[in-house]
């Protein structure tokens, strides 16, 4: 308030008086400059003096106007703030009056109403009659309720002519063996994990043969009679699992023990005895070696026949070739070989064709039959069951299916890694690792893993390796097409990855 009073009484009036004095001084200075310019002899000097007076006068007037304007603006700001404070006070008084009026109105309204008495009670009220607690009854856990659930192969047993599923428990393994049989790669896969342990299984009764058990006459080379199965089930069998690419081996070994399921072979072509050619597609490693299929007479024995005469010539190598028929016929090759693989159809004992090597014309290979049941290679059974082979009659083979699939022009997928089943000690790979204590001098310093060959392989190209079964190979690179690069006996080259197994699978 004092500042406002000082501006109104002193600053602004003094500024106005200064402006009036400047106006009068400017008039006198103008008269002097005009007379001086007329009377002076040196016109230039008189002009310069006039300019100096003019500049000084303008500066003085401008300063005085600026000071007076600032004082007026400051006065206006002070008055505006006072007005805002007064407005706020008036609003506060108005709100106070409104509140007082509302209180009075409520009081008057309350006089016209009646009082309401409310009883205060607890929100939660305990029940009058307490319920008796129910006694806990423990129910035992039934570990067999989920035995028939899932995609695994169910065991079948023949009882009074009816097929009834037999339940099995969880499998485990106590002492894992350090060797495994060199069964060829299969396309059938199980559903158990890769590291599932196993244990010794109890023998089960032989199953009955379903209607879709065999789908091709060529399969009869791998079929065995239930009599053999019955004799096999008289002793416990130990199965060992492995990790990595042979994980499905464990599942099949645990869910179909003792069931002689044959490996499917390609359906016979309908072109008769004419020569045909199988163009091998490139881009995948070759499957294990292929051997001619055996006729049915060498596999299925008649009742009462001598075991030695029917099974004396069967070896693990022949059963391996029979089980790899589907893999070799449906799998591809990494590159086109210089000499095309050639096959011809020959008459079979049961009317189906056999394949042998001849010079032939071009035709697509037949596709494999649909897999109605999981396939398990039968390897190493013959040495154990020759004495009991004639105990049971041989069931007749079922008729082939009516719906044979058409040929597929798309190239078949490459064969999967080997899927073996450790059923017999006679079918394991006997290998001796001379480098178990330390790597040899020719071994590479940096390698991915050390593997053992489970099949013999002869190179087709100069950049490939040749090795025998049981050879130790150091893998230095794994290609996406299934071929590995490794070192064996100071020789570096390529080899198919499904011909070897990691040594860790044997030592686990």
From Swiss-Prot:
Domain of life: Eukaryota
Domain SH3 residues, every copy: 446-505
Residue list for modification Phosphothreonine: 174, 178, 215, 507
Keyword Coiled coil tagged: yes
Tissue and organ distribution: Widely expressed, with highest expression in brain.
Keyword line: Acetylation, Cell projection, Chromosomal rearrangement, Coiled coil, Cytoplasm, Cytoskeleton, Host-virus interaction, Nucleus, Phosphoprotein, SH3 domain, Synapse
Name this protein carries in UniProt: Abl interactor 1
Organism from which the protein derives: Homo sapiens
Lineage, uppermost ranks: Eukaryota, Metazoa, Chordata, Craniata, Vertebrata
């Amino acid at each position: 308030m004092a500042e406002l009073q000082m501006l109104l009484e002193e600053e602004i009036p003094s500024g106005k008086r200064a402006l009036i004095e400047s106006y009068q001084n400017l008039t006198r200075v103008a008269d002097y400059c005009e007379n001086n310019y007329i009377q002076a002899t040196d016109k230039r000097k008189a002009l310069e003096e006039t300019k100096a007076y003019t500049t000084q006068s303008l500066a003085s007037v401008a300063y005085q106007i600026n000071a007076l304007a600032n004082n007026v603006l400051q006065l206006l700001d002070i008055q505006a703030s006072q007005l805002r404070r007064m407005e706020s006070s008036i609003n506060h008084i108005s709100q106070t009056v409104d509140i007082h009026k509302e209180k009075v109105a409520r009081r008057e309204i309350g006089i016209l109403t009646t009082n309401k008495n409310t009883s205060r009670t607890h929100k939660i009220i305990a029940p009058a009659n307490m319920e008796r607690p129910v006694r806990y009854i423990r129910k035992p856990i039934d570990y067999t309720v989920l035995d028939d659930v899932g995609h695994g192969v169910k065991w079948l047993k023949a009882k009074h002519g009816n097929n009834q599923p037999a339940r099995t428990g969880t499998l485990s393994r106590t002492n894992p063996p350090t060797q495994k049989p060199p069964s060829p790669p299969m396309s059938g896969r199980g559903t158990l994990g890769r590291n599932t342990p196993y244990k010794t299984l109890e023998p089960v009764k032989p199953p009955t043969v379903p209607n879709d058990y065999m789908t091709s006459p060529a399969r009869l080379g791998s079929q065995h009679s239930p009599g053999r199965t019955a004799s096999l089930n008289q002793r416990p069998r130990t199965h060992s699992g492995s990790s990595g690419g042979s994980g499905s081996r464990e599942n099949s070994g645990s869910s179909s023990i003792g069931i002689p399921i044959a490996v499917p072979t390609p359906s016979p072509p309908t072109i008769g005895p004419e020569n045909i050619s199988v163009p091998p597609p490139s881009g995948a490693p070759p499957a294990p070696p292929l051997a001619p299929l055996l006729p049915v007479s060498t596999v299925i024995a008649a009742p009462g026949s001598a075991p030695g005469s029917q099974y004396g010539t069967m070896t693990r190598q022949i059963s391996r070739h029979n089980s790899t028929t589907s893999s070799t016929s449906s799998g591809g090759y990494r590159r086109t070989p210089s000499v095309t693989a050639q096959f011809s159809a020959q008459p079979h004992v049961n009317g189906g064709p056999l394949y042998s090597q001849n010079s032939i014309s071009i035709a697509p290979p037949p596709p494999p039959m649909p897999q109605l049941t999981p396939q398990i290679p039968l390897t190493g059974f013959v040495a154990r069951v020759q004495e009991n082979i004639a105990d049971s009659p041989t069931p007749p083979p079922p008729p082939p299916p009516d719906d044979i699939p058409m040929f597929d022009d798309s190239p078949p997928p490459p064969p999967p890694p080997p899927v073996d089943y450790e059923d017999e000690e006679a079918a394991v790979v006997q290998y001796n690792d001379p480098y178990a204590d330390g790597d040899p001098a020719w071994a590479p310093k940096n390698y991915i893993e050390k593997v053992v060959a489970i099949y013999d392989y002869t190179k087709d190209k100069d950049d490939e390796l040749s090795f025998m079964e049981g050879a130790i190979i150091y893998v230095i690179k794994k290609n996406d097409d299934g071929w590995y690069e490794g070192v064996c006996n100071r020789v570096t080259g390529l080899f198919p990855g499904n011909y070897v197994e990691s040594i860790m699978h044997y030592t686990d």
